[in-house]
Regions:
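AMP-forming adenylation/ATP pyrophosphatase catalytic core
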Residues: 153-276
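ATP-dependent adenylation/nucleotidyltransferase module used to activate substrates
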Residues: 5-202
Length: 276
């Protein structure tokens, strides 16, 4: 909400004008931060959604949330955190668009994240969804055909705006409807961070963050463990997945796998997971 004041010759009128709302997928990295800043600069009220999966590359595990909450507070946006658990495991069995170089179902994964964002968009009456995706930055999910597949799979065709690269992409519904203008959208392409760092300086962002967390399923060694798990267990539990993240793993036969801790802390973690 903001105040608009109109002054005439002999009187003035003050109106309360409600800002248009958008939903942002917020990872905590620089790109999603810049996407939020760009929309705020254009006068939108931004509400953020942070997505966690069992395979997010965070040392603090499933309880992680403080850092992203701090990022949201610094940006002045509301934050909703969504954890994709069992439904993510089900998707991982047979992703519609397959895997990347590891066991990473990037297109299906992004579609699930946008579906979560779509629910929040509908709940708060937002106009569209934004993300920090950059055209050509990631090999599987950030080229134009993949971006289109993600929109279709999530039921958000025309409703996803990627502010950092939007001027290089086809017009979205918000642009066609006059909510945003192409001249205010970015033309960033590829893996270089030069333009993002320039924007960070412009927005007064000190110590720009790196990428907002990674995915363990892109790691070659972890992917081998995950493939072995899904090969031998039809529906792995969250404990099964957490065990993949620690120790040394030895497949003894089709029914037995040995997990050995590499230190006292890992042994304690294995004990806790085994007793649950």
């Amino acid at each position: 909400m903001y105040v608009a004041k109109f002054v005439y010759a002999d009187y003035s009128v003050t109106l309360m004008v409600e800002k248009k709302k958008v939903v942002a997928l917020l990872s905590g990295g620089l790109d999603s931060t810049l996407a939020v800043k760009t929309m705020q600069k254009q006068g939108f009220e931004v509400s953020a959604v942070a997505i966690k999966t069992p395979f997010c590359d965070f040392d603090c595990g499933r309880g992680c949330g403080f850092e992203i909450r701090e990022k949201a507070d610094n940006l002045g946006v509301d934050l909703k955190t969504v954890y994709l658990g069992d439904e993510y495991v089900e998707m991982l069995k047979h992703p519609k668009y397959g895997f990347g170089s590891g066991m990473n179902p990037c297109i299906d994964c992004r579609a699930m994240m946008f579906e979560a964002g779509k629910k929040h968009m509908e709940e708060i009456g937002a106009e569209f969804i934004i993300s920090g995706e950059v055209l050509g930055q990631r090999p599987m999910s950030q080229f134009a055909p993949a971006l289109k597949k993600i929109e279709k799979l999530s039921g958000l065709e025309g409703k996803i705006v990627r502010p950092l690269s939007a001027a290089l992409l086809p017009p979205t519904d918000p642009e066609k409807n006059g909510l945003i203008k192409r001249k205010d959208l970015g033309m960033i392409r590829g893996r270089s961070r030069k333009e993002q760092l320039r924007m960070a300086k412009e927005f007064g962002i000190e110590d720009p963050p790196n990428a907002g967390g990674g995915c363990l399923l892109t790691d070659p060694a972890f992917s081998l463990r995950a493939k072995d798990l899904f090969k031998h267990i039809e529906t792995p539990t969250m404990n099964d997945i957490d065990l993949l993240k620690i120790g040394r793993h030895f497949r003894l036969d089709k029914n037995v796998k040995l997990v050995v801790g590499r230190n006292k802390d890992e042994n304690e973690m294995i004990k806790v997971l085994a007793l649950q």
